[in-house]
Structures are given as C-alpha cells and as structure tokens.
Design a protein with these regions (language model features):
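Regulatory alphaC helix of protein kinase catalytic domains
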Residues: 8-18
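A short glycine-centered flexible hinge/capping loop motif at secondary-structure junctions
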Residues: 182-186, 385-389, 426
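Amphipathic alpha-helical coiled-coil scaffold segments and their short linker/junction regions
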Residues: 18-22, 73-91, 187, 226-290, ...
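Periplasmic alpha-helical coiled-coil/stalk elements that build and connect Gram-negative outer-membrane
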Residues: 12, 40, 138-254, 353-356, ...
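Alpha-helical heptad-repeat coiled-coil segments that mediate oligomerization/polymerization in large
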Residues: 188, 346, 353, 388-392
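Small/polar-residue-enriched beta-strand and adjacent coil segments characteristic
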Residues: 13, 52-138, 261-342, 353, ...
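Acidic, low-complexity, intrinsically disordered peripheral segments
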Residues: 5-7, 61-67, 72, 408-447
Length: 447
C-alpha cells in the first residue's frame, strides 16, 4: 500500500493564530480557571451570612439502663401512712436512659454578630476575583507578545530564506556568465573562481536559512500549543508610522495596566484582612437551635426542641490576634510600596519600548532609501562585468551589499513589530495591536 504524502497545513493569518493561542495556551487557560475558582469562592463566602443546619445521627449503647430510683421516698411515705397498703403505692422509679439509644438531632447555628468578619470575608472574596481577572488580562498580554515574536519570527525566517534563494540564484547565473566570459577570453580564471566561492557561500547561507525556518516553525507551534505542523504565516511584517506620543502610552499604563489592577485588588485584600483581624477582638453572637426527630428514646427530662442565643468571647490567645493584626497592616504597607515601584518601572519601561519602536522605524526608513541605491549598484556592476570592464569581485560585492540591505530592512521591520507588542504590553493595551497593524498609517514590509 502506497503511503499518501501528508497534506500541507493551510496558511495561517495572524488573527487566526491569535485566536488559536488564546484558545489553547495552557498558561492562559489556567488563569481563566482561577477566575472561575475565585467566582465560586465568592459565592461560597455569601453562605457565611446564612444559618448552618446539620444532621448528626447518634447511636449509643450503655452498660445498663439509667434509672431514676425514688423508692426511699416511697418507703418514708408508707411509714408515715401505715394504713395505706403497700400494694396500692406503685414503685417510685423510672427509666431515664435506655441501654440502647438512637438520636436523630437537627441542629442549627446562625451568626448574628461577628465584628464585621463575615463582611470582610465577602469583600476579600470579591478582591480575589478582581485579582484573578487582572491576572488573566496579564496572561493575555503575555500570550500576545509571545505570539508576535514567534509568528513574525517565522515570517522573518521565511522572508530571509526567500532572499537567500534569490541571492543564490543570482550568483549561480553570475558563475555561468563568468565561465562563458572565461571561455571567450574576456576575464581571467581568478574572476571565475571568485564567483564560484561566492556561490558556495550563498548556498551555505541558504541551507542555514532553511534550518532557521524549521526552528522558528517549532517555536510558533509551541506558542499555539499545537502538536501538528503549523502553516506558513501570511500576515506580512509591518511598520506603523502613526503612533501617538509616548506620554499617551505612559498615561494608559498608569491608568489600566493589569499589574496595577492586581496590586489594587491586593491592597483591598490587605485592607479586609485588617478589618477581619480587628473583628476578632469583638465577641461573636449567634442563635442556635436543636430539634430531635426521634422522640421515642427521649428521657422525661429531655426536650424535643430548644432554641437560644449564645456568645463566644476570646479572653486570651497568647497575643495571636495582635500579631495577626500587625501582619495584616504590614501587608498593607508592602502593597503600597510595590505599587509605587511598579508605577515608576512602568513609566521607564514604556519610555524604553517607545524608543525601541522609534529606532526600528527610523532604521527601516533609512534602509528603504538605501535599497534603491543597492539595486542600482548591482545592475551597474553586472552590466560592467558583462561588457568586460568590471570584475567578478565587484559584482559579488554589489549583490552581497544588496542582500545585506534587504535583510537588515526585514530585521528592522521585525524589530519594530516586537517593540510595538512590548510597548502595548507595557501600557496595558495589547488589544490595540490589530488596530495599529491595519491602520492607514501602517505599511506592509515584503522582501
């Protein structure tokens, strides 16, 4: 049976890759699972406001029945009234507890006052939900950055391979021209050898570019959490020329960065921890009740049901409450200091990434102008060589110079794309990436 060749994976656009990464990345899925966990914990915390009702069946076996024996009193009564026949006076005894007892009690307990601890627990649960939500946003930003690096890294590797292939094809044609001119006696043997050496080096670089493509493809598959081969990226590299000033990105970072949102949630969480520890100094007041469902084994002195109000006051705990309160206040101080540092770090990070994007954009613009000169130089050197007035080395140098400009131009575009993704992550605006990529002020970069 002949094996059919494996089907080529379909081309992959960046929006498709982003949807796949957000749907399959384990770190992001774990962050979303934590949000669901915190949501359920928030619902569970609301149950603290309600009474708890429990059912605890008990079977007890005693060594004997427990009796209430009042016969000594009966004897005294008979002595005081000798005219009464003893047979007419029943025994003064009763069974309080049988040897075998089955109890089916329903018990209830309802907190009435806890010093604010239940409210603090609910507000803390809400803060944990917000913390998990901000963490998920942070994970989404990280997935976008990783995908940009991997997706456009593969695109860059494919473009570089295409450039290397064109250079190799051009040098192979140059070798053929050199051999023909050598046979015609128009150039020396050394000129043909120079062309063949350059062709061999171009072939080596082309093979190396092929390996780089496979490495980049494996990296993209890892980001997409895909065990299958991934298709070639069809979204080209780009450079956006309509970025707003750096101050706008800095303001956005300080207003809505998910790391700051996490610290805000943790600040609230620390505040609720302080409130809960203060509440521990107050008495706990609760209502309680009991109802016995099996009444046959009840003793004459036991009620079928009871209800009441109780209180619990912690008189001494070895200073534990004071230390826990101090720890909660220290946590508040810690979060406040972390917030100050993060705001300063975000401002610096935004400024650095903005400058990186500007540098890459300027490099691209300069190389775009240089590319036309390199193309014209190669045409002139090739024409001069074919006419016998130029050397093979000049043609090779011109072609390699053209290749260098083309590759550096692609690398500058890739550097811009990466810097843009990191700038948007630093400012908490990862969701703007697609909008900037397709904006009117953006140009697509091809070899």
């Amino acid at each position: 049976m002949a094996w059919l060749p494996a089907a080529e994976p379909p081309p992959l656009s960046f929006p498709e890759a982003l949807a796949a990464a957000r749907g399959g990345n384990e770190s992001l899925l774990a962050a979303r699972a934590e949000v669901r966990q915190r949501e359920e914990e928030k619902k569970a915390a609301k149950g603290l406001y309600f009474p708890t009702v429990s059912f605890a069946p008990l079977y007890t076996h005693l060594n004997d029945d427990i009796l209430l024996d009042l016969n000594p009193i009966r004897d005294v009564v008979l002595k005081l009234h000798p005219q009464v026949p003893p047979a007419l006076v029943p025994p003064f005894e009763d069974t309080l507890f049988k040897q075998d007892m089955l109890r089916l009690p329903l018990t209830a307990r309802w907190p009435l006052f806890t010093g604010g601890r239940i409210g603090a627990a609910n507000r803390a649960a809400e803060a944990r939900v917000r913390d998990a939500g901000a963490q998920t946003r942070q994970a989404e930003e990280g997935v976008l950055r990783s995908l940009v690096r991997a997706y456009f890294g593969l695109r860059l590797a494919l473009e570089e391979k295409a450039v290397r292939a064109e250079v190799l094809a051009g040098l192979e044609q140059h070798v053929r021209d050199a051999r023909r001119l050598e046979e015609e006696g128009l150039i020396a043997k050394v000129e043909r050898l120079n062309a063949e050496v350059a062709r061999a080096e171009a072939e080596r670089q082309f093979k190396r570019a092929g390996h780089d493509v496979e490495i980049a493809r494996a990296g993209l598959a890892n980001v997409l959490a895909s065990d299958a081969a991934v298709g070639d990226p069809v979204t080209p590299l780009f450079v956006a020329f309509d970025l707003e000033p750096a101050d706008r990105f800095r303001e956005a970072a300080l207003a809505s960065h998910p790391a700051l949102e996490r610290l805000a949630a943790q600040r609230d969480l620390a505040g609720e921890a302080v409130a809960a520890q203060k509440g521990a100094f107050w008495p706990e007041v609760f209502a309680y009740g009991l109802y016995e469902m099996r009444k046959t084994d009840l003793s004459p002195i036991e009620p079928e049901w009871l209800a009441g109000v109780g209180a619990r006051i912690e008189l001494f705990d070895g200073g534990s409450r004071l230390k826990k309160l101090a720890a909660a206040r220290a946590q508040q101080d810690r979060v406040k200091l972390l917030d100050q540092k993060l705001r300063r770090d975000l401002g610096t990070l935004v400024e650095r990434q903005y400058r990186e994007a500007e540098k890459a954009r300027e490099q691209y613009a300069a190389l775009e102008a240089t590319r036309a000169l390199a193309d014209e130089s190669l045409r002139a050197r090739t024409r001069a060589f074919e006419e016998g007035v130029g050397t093979s080395l000049e043609v090779v140098d011109a072609r390699l110079a053209q290749e260098k400009v083309r590759l550096e131009r692609l690398a500058a575009a890739y550097g811009f794309v990466n810097a843009l993704a990191e700038l948007l992550e630093a400012s908490g605006q990862g969701d703007r990436f697609e909008g900037l990529r397709t904006s009117p002020g953006t140009i697509e970069v091809r070899p």
